[in-house]
Amino acid sequence: MNPVLAQSSQPRGRSLWQDARARLLRNRAAVTAIALLSLISLLVIAAPWLSPHEFDAIDWDNISTPPSLANGHWFGTDAVGRDLFVRTLYGGRMSLMVGIIATGVSLLIGIAWGATAGYLGGRIDGIMMRIVDILYAMPFMFFVILLMVFFGRNIYLIFIAIGAINWLDMARIVRGQTLTLKNREFIEAAIACGVSTPRIILRHIVPNLAGVVAVYVTLTIPQVILVESFLSFLGLGVQEPDTSWGALVNEGAQDMESAPWSLLFPASFLATTLFCFNFIGDGLRDALDPRDR
């Protein structure tokens, strides 16, 4: 038999990421969630071109009017006559931006802290993780509320404050993964070649945490959005004229009896987005689980 033909007839193996992608695409719930989340993301990005109304413009002839195609207010208007469709999309842009940026902040802190503690080990690991335990015991939501009260409702402060309270779980997860990775052969080979500790962490430890990080991101973004929504519901979140889904839900709850649409549409977008992220996170976790390969 021709050796070339024999070699070409052998089945090709799939990498971890190829196998994970194939399994993720077989997960109908995750695929549907990805499609819905992509649609919502496109809508919030294209908000200025989807409606003739500005998000802060007041239509004095249509105050608290129900949804209608005739007057161009597809989701109706709020209590002061602003178009609810465009405000819902602008609110989604703000909520998603808070979720992504704050998650990025927590990701950077958590990976740096957890990878350093896990790789160095010993007394340094003990001290760093005791600090994490102490921070776990602190009422961080109360801390964030105090920051909002004393320094004002600055949107950048919201990014940093929410991100700074969500890195603790990531630090523990990364530390656990690093403890298993640092005894692998490729790490020992890097040490034998004289590679510095920071380079080992950045070039060999962190890239091998990509699967864990991907799952963490999809599960943390909805948590951050919920925190921001809770702060906005308390009146401590985004300032007018800007808005977010949490702020719109707060406004809609006040007019729920007279104008139920002002609560229905923002709450529906918020709930759908949260469910999408959770389904995607569950799908990624199942796809990357080596026990199911």
Report the location of each language-model feature.
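Residue-level signature of catalytic and energy-coupling elements of molecular machines
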Residues: L24, L42, I134
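Short, membrane-interfacial amphipathic segments enriched in basic
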Residues: N2-A20, A70-D83, L120, P198-L202, ...
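Alpha-helical transmembrane segments of integral membrane proteins
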Residues: A79-R293
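Residue-level signal for helical boundary/lining positions with a hydrophobic bias
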Residues: R23, L50, W74-T77, D255, ...
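Short, strongly hydrophobic transmembrane alpha-helices
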Residues: A29-P48, I111, A271
